Amino acid sequence: MNNKIIEALIYIQGEEGLSSEQLQKVLKSESISSARALLKVFKEKWNNEQHGIKVEEFNDVYKFATIKDVKDYVSELVTIIKKQRLSNAAIEVAGIVAYKQPISKSQINKIRGVASEIVVNTLLIKGIIEEVGIAQTPGNPILYGVTAKFYDYFKIKSLHELPNLKEFDDTGEYESIEDFDLYSSQREDQDE
C-alpha cells in the first residue's frame, strides 16, 4: 500500500517532487529516516520495472522523469502541443489580461463569470501571460500581464493595435463591444 501512496504523491507533486519530510508527515511516520527508507525502496522497485518514466532523487526530493528511450517521442509531443491553437476560452482570457493588465485571477473570473484558473495556468505554461506582480490588497493576489509571445501569437506589435473596447464596469459587465473581435487574428491565418 505504501508504494501506491508514494506513487500518487510523487505524481501529484509534479516538478516540485516529494521530500522525505513531506512523506513522513503524510504517513505520520515516526521519523524522516523511515520515510526516506520507504522512498529509496520505492525508487529501486519502480526503476527495476518497465516504465516510460523513472524515479529520480535530487537532494532528498523524489520526482518522476522520462527515460532516455522515450525522449524523442516526448519531444515530438511537446512540439505538437506548442503548435496547437489556443482555445476560445484561452483567447478570451488572454484578451482580458491584455486589456486590463495587471489583473488578478479573481478579477478575470469576475469579468468572465466563470472560474478561469485552468485557462490562466495554460496561458502561463504556453508563455502567453506571466506573473507581473502582487496586488497590495487582502490576500496579496498575483497579478498577470501579457508577454512578448502574446504579441507574436496575435501578430501585433503593441497593445494599441487591439480594437477599442469600452471599459468594464465594476460588475464585470461591459457596455459595448461592437467593433471587438478577439478571435479574428486567429481566423485570418487559418487559410494560410
Curated annotation (Swiss-Prot):
One record GO biological process: DNA replication
Keyword field: Cell cycle, Cell division, Chromosome partition, Cytoplasm
Any Pfam family hit: SMC_ScpB
GO cellular component labels: cytoplasm
Keyword ATP-binding: no
InterPro entries listed in its UniProt record: ScpB_csome_segregation, WH-like_DNA-bd_sf, WH_DNA-bd_sf
UniProt similarity note: Belongs to the ScpB family.
Protein name (database record): Segregation and condensation protein B
Lineage: Bacteria, Bacillati, Mycoplasmatota, Mycoplasmoidales, Metamycoplasmataceae
Gene behind the chain: scpB
